[in-house]
Amino acid sequence: MQQKPSRPVKATLRTRQPLDSEESDLQPDSNAADSSTSSSAQLLALLSRLFAPLRRSPNFSATLQHVKGLLYDQQYLAAFGTESEEGERWREVYAARWVPSRAVIYQRIFDECDIAQHLGWQTPSGETNGGGGGERPRSEEEELEQERERAKLRRRLRQEGKSADEISQAVAELEQQFRAARSSKADSKGEGAAAVVDAIMIGAGAGSEVVALGAVLGVAAAGRASSGDADPTLAAAEYRPPPRVRVHAVDQGSWDVLLDKMAQGLRDAWPTLDSEHVEEDGGDQQQPRFDVRFVKGNILDNKMITTAAGSSSPVIDFGSSSLRLITICFTITELLLQSRLETLRLLSTISRSAPSGTLFLIVESASLAQIPIGQEGRTYPLGRLLDHALCGGGDKGGGGGGGVWEILKSEDAKWYRMPNDADEVYNAMGKGTKVKLENSRVVLRLYRKR
């Protein structure tokens, strides 16, 4: 299951102007947009260093055409699963061509969804705590409930004759209780040492979402350091380093070698992602703070997500207490076309198993967002199908989800455009085949487990 293709680096990038068919209100012109384009430049520079030797190869274009032919003929296992030196080259050429634009898009989406904050690598605005397990985002329902609690408290204190200063102090203490409650739901186990959180990325073999997540965390950690959030003089009770993040990239192809290269490139670019001393099995060991683990297999195979005889946990454990994030990027339509029944069963398993507070991000190309239903040529919008499977229908419907998910973000046709200088940044490392980075219009859903 794979996402299929539909000079010195500059410090900042400008975003391409929209085409006539694109939505003009998506033009980033704020400080946040400047920050986003700068971090995109860092990510593209990393990928440029990684793939430049490959693009300079005289056989790059011919190999790329061969890979395109395999994809056109839907020979995905041949393109991505051939166990040979030639097969490894096919995978690298595919990644060099399509990963950069996908990674930039996913990086922006992760930023928009506050994934770094959710994983404990970025503190909420205005706070200087060291982080730890992080604070989960609030839904509109929670915000309304908390505002009702504040209003109720103010009303009661006024009736008791309290002064304005006393009321303000009481409301501030209530706000601290709200933050503590949110953080406790996101924190994983462990005291003193950094916690461990897990992210399961389905269909992530080529690594677009993996490098995007690594870049988002690396930039967030650098921001914490520059703002003083990581001040070692803070009391131990106040400061905790960001948790180790274990990424489980699940795919049918043989992507382990390429993912190892990408993970090492991320750790070289952002040393905060590199190893740390942790106590495991009674000894002190070095473990990457950003740990990428490849899991080969078909996620629709029931053996992947159920506990085998003699095993304490399944290959992919959606019920792990340390699970914080699940992603399915540019893969969900392929799964549904492969088997709608098995895909809905997978969503049901995730819904039953995932711990409360887990974020579930699904992204798909808007051009693939009409799912065929039945034999009459009818189609059904992907976003509506996902919402019904995960959020609607109660215990009797919704693909078994029982309404256990709430929608935090919903887009049915949002454009993500490459910065103007993206091609120049990515193609900057010497001569070779020039790669054109492409805009994408996507369907996006961000859910949170209740």
Sequence positions of predicted segments:
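Conserved S-adenosyl-L-methionine
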Residues: G203-G205, D251
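Class I SAM-dependent methyltransferase Rossmann-like catalytic core
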Residues: L77-G130, G134-V196, S208, A215
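C-terminal His-loop and adjacent cap/lid subdomain of alpha/beta-hydrolase
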Residues: G207, A212, T379
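Histidine-anchored nucleotide/phosphate-binding helix
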Residues: A212-A221
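Domain-level detector for long C-terminal conserved domains
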Residues: Q2-K10, R16-N59, R136, E149-R158, ...
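Alpha-helical recognition domains of nuclear gene-regulatory proteins
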Residues: L70, R97, I109-E112, V216, ...
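Class I SAM-dependent methyltransferase core
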Residues: A199-M201
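Phospho-regulated, Ser/Thr/Pro-rich intrinsically disordered or coiled-coil terminal scaffolds
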Residues: Q65-L77
